[in-house]
């Protein structure tokens, strides 16, 4: 029996191992439908006696919200690289949470400012709001901000000649979104790994692609964005990620502007002109803050252009690293906008922000979304249309009952797990 069980597990799904470094036995035997009989029948091919064995306990790759999958990921990376693999991620989760809290707090401030600016704009409808006024007209930065916020962010950020993936897996329920086949019986518990999420994050770059490293043969090209967005099409996931990064960039950009007296003075001059044209010079200070908010928003778009082009953006700006002029803000998103930004060489990259955003997801969410991607890729890219993560066996215990002479029976168990 032991030899037959080992032989069965030796027939692991090779595409799963080659592509994702994960061991698993296809319990459906290329039918797409798991039954215990398929496994037991296969054991008889390797010498087990029919009718003497039954599956006492079993685990599938997706069991316990993907815990079986995560356990293999952790052991694979620990054995291959040791703790060095996650050394640079230690402490990054707390940093990511702190950044998120700042972004949430600043978003409230942004919303309050937006309400004030709506009131200002409503009080002076004659002022040109398009940001593309004709010669001699004063362009309204508040109107520019309104226009930008109503545009699809990806269309403003990404180069005009870059084709954005429109791929979708709608109608193909991933393992995270369907009723799953669950394992049964008692097996040794998977030992908790305090660094599991860090190992999952470290596993991502070598196994899943992103916007900056997309491959067009994949069901979803922006896989890392899917881990964060969870939508079944590339465009939505990319939009979610760009918006999250923009929120992270807004606060430090706005705070820098508050320290730059030259830029504050520029904003105040423009605010004074806008307020005068609105017929209410007393609004200058309020409008100036609105101009600075719009400027920070515009700079955040410039940051996204750098990041998506493969460059880096410093966490905190200086006079030297600030990119967008006030006149450039008024052209942003218009036909006069070049749509590009000079590359940055220091700071955080797009991939760094993806890691930060992934750290904000729960480990359960990451596990199951990884399994979604893994399953879609095996089905659609690696010619395994039958593959189901919840039919992929990782561990099993077989109970055997042998008939001896004189009516004596002998009962024993055989356990096997991919290690």
Predicted regions located by residue number:
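Long, compositionally biased low-complexity segments
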Residues: 22-419
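Alpha-helical assembly-interface signal, strongest on the long, hydrophobic N-terminal helix that forms
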Residues: 2-34
């Amino acid at each position: 029996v032991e030899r037959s069980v080992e032989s069965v597990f030796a027939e692991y799904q090779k595409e799963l191992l080659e592509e994702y470094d994960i061991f698993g036995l296809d319990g459906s035997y290329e039918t797409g439908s798991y039954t215990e009989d398929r496994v037991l029948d296969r054991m008889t091919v390797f010498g087990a006696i029919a009718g003497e064995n039954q599956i006492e306990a079993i685990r599938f790759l997706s069991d316990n919200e993907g815990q079986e999958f995560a356990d293999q990921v952790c052991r694979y990376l620990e054995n291959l690289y040791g703790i060095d693999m996650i050394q640079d991620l230690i402490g990054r989760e707390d940093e990511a949470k702190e950044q998120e809290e700042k972004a949430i707090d600043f978003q409230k401030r942004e919303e309050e400012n937006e309400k004030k600016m709506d009131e200002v704009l409503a009080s002076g409808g004659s002022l040109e709001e398009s940001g593309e006024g004709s010669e001699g007209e004063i362009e309204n930065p508040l109107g520019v901000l309104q226009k930008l916020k109503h545009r699809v962010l990806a269309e403003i950020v990404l180069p005009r000649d870059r084709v954005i993936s429109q791929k979708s897996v709608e109608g193909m329920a991933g393992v995270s979104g369907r009723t799953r086949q669950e394992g049964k019986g008692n097996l040794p518990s998977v030992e908790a790994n305090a660094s599991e999420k860090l190992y999952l994050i470290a596993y991502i770059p070598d196994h899943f692609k992103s916007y900056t490293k997309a491959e067009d043969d994949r069901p979803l090209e922006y896989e890392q964005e899917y881990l964060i967005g969870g939508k079944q099409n590339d465009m939505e996931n990319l939009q979610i990620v760009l918006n999250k990064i923009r929120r992270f960039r807004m606060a430090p950009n706005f705070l820098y502007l508050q320290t730059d007296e030259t830029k504050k003075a520029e904003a105040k001059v423009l605010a004074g002109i806008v307020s005068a044209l609105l017929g209410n010079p007393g609004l200058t200070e309020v409008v100036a803050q609105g101009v600075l908010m719009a400027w920070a928003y515009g700079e955040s778009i410039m940051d996204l252009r750098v990041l998506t082009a493969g460059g880096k953006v410093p966490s905190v700006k200086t006079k030297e690293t600030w990119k967008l002029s006030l006149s450039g803000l008024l052209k942003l998103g218009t036909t006069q906008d070049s749509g590009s930004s000079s590359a940055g060489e220091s700071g955080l990259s797009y991939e760094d922000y993806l890691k930060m955003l992934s750290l904000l997801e729960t480990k359960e969410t990451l596990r199951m979304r990884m399994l979604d991607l893994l399953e879609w890729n095996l089905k659609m890219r690696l010619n395994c249309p039958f593959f189901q993560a919840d039919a992929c066996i990782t561990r099993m215990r077989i109970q055997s009952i042998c008939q001896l002479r004189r009516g004596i029976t002998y009962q024993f168990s055989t356990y096997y797990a991919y290690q």
